[in-house]
From Swiss-Prot:
The lineage of its organism: Bacteria, Bacillati, Bacillota, Bacilli, Lactobacillales. Its cofactor is FMNH2. Homotetramer. Belongs to the chorismate synthase family. This is Chorismate synthase. It comes from Streptococcus agalactiae serotype III (strain NEM316). It is an enzyme of class 4 (lyase).
Length: 388
């Protein structure tokens, strides 16, 4: 499975083309729109989310509610584009119109300045538009399709916030993936402990009032994953490495860990490794899951536990100092529409990219033209593992 996305933040639309989805997967626009709505939710989102009510258009690869095995084309219209017709015009326009929303005061922490230097732009909006997190709309849409496939083969996925700014959320022990999904969806800040809800909302309000932003840590959990996805044979076939790349590719993500992650660097081996046991009903199991479901770059049958850290959104309503690229004089950075935090939305994106990587790996191991063959292949493999 592979995909390509295209589109600018204030352009006419966002587009994705996906290749490699097996035929026979039940799929409708509603399945995708549900996740697009989740991405637009969450406490602390800004005015852009009030303008855009994302709805996907499926224009190829699906007929009568089922995939055809051919490339799938997805499009999401940017409703806000109607206010940007001149600024985002494909055709050349008058110089005075170009100057209306020209960006020449790059924002620290964004792609503005480096992108402008790399591609020789005199208007940094050219970098801003594509580097915007608006692009993640399409990765969520793609992830929604991936999650449909995972569900068909008994794999479920969920996410929740474990750190909001500097506030760590206490997570109840031994929650299932389904329980995490339900609790997180019931929270406006995507947490699983309701006792922290109001505290986090108040914190977001105070940060917004101060013209500042906050980041945090998001945890994604995947259950029902077969043993042996990924490989130890080559560096670029390790599945945890692929997931790490996908997570850090999300806008504003600066780090990733699995299981105990960086904490394992402070412990002894006897405190970190997961003891192995065997039962007639379950086969091989681990007595703990400190390694987050991976050994040797391969899934070991335990739930995948991966966390990503998101830096605070760089656009500040009380902007930091920058430089005017025309005069090189000090100047306050440009202010674009932004949010005090986008952690709940980022969790939906993280869930989507992890699901997409997993489906790509599943389809590589269990190469199938249609969903019937895929489900049979996975079923046969699970039976083999249970009797190993």
């Amino acid at each position: 499975m592979r995909y390509l996305t295209a589109g600018e933040s204030h352009g006419p639309s966002l587009t994705a083309i996906i290749e490699g989805i097996p035929a026979g997967l039940k799929l409708s626009a509603k399945d995708i729109n549900e996740d697009l709505k989740r991405r637009q939710g969450g406490y602390g989102r800004g005015n852009r989310m009030k303008i855009e009510t994302d709805q996907v258009i499926i224009s190829s690869g699906v007929r009568h509610g089922k995939t055809l095995g051919s490339p799938i084309t997805l499009t999401v219209t940017n409703k806000d584009h109607s206010k940007w017709l001149d600024i985002m015009s494909v055709e050349d326009i008058e110089e005075r119109l170009k100057q209306k929303r020209r960006i020449k005061h790059p924002r620290p922490g964004h792609a503005d300045l480096v992108g402008g230097i790399k591609y020789r732009f005199d208007d940094l909006r050219n970098a801003l538009e594509r580097s915007s997190a608006r692009e993640t709309t399409m990765r969520v849409a793609i992830g929604a399709i991936a999650k449909r496939i995972l569900k068909e083969i008994g794999i479920e996925i969920a996410n929740h916030i474990v750190v909001f700014g500097g506030k760590e959320i206490t997570v109840p022990d031994k929650l299932t993936v389904q329980q995490i999904k339900v609790l997180s969806s019931q929270s406006q800040v995507a947490i699983v402990n309701p006792s922290f809800e109001q505290e986090i909302k108040d914190y977001i309000d105070s940060v917004k009032k101060a013209g500042d932003t906050i980041g945090g840590v998001i945890e994604t959990i995947v259950g029902g994953v077969p043993v042996g996805l990924g490989s130890y044979v080559h560096w670029d076939r390790k599945l945890d490495a692929k997931i790490a790349q996908a997570v850090v590719s999300i806008n504003a993500f600066k780090g990733v860990e699995f299981g105990l992650g960086f904490k394992s660097g402070f412990l002894k081996g006897s405190q970190v490794m997961d003891s192995i046991s065997w039962t007639k009903d379950q086969g091989y199991i681990r007595q703990s899951n400190n390694l987050g479901g991976f050994e040797g770059g391969m899934t070991n049958g335990e739930p995948i536990i991966v966390r990503g850290v998101m830096k605070p959104i760089p656009t500040l309503y009380k902007p930091l100092m920058s430089v005017d690229i025309d005069t090189h004089e000090p100047y306050r950075a440009t202010v674009e529409r932004s949010d005090p935090t986008a952690l709940p939305a980022a969790g939906v994106v993280m869930e989507a990219v992890v699901a997409t990587v997993l489906v790509t790996e599943v389809l590589e191991k269990f190469s199938s033209d249609n969903m019937y063959e895929l489900k049979e292949a996975v079923k046969l493999y699970r039976n083999y593992v249970n009797h190993f």
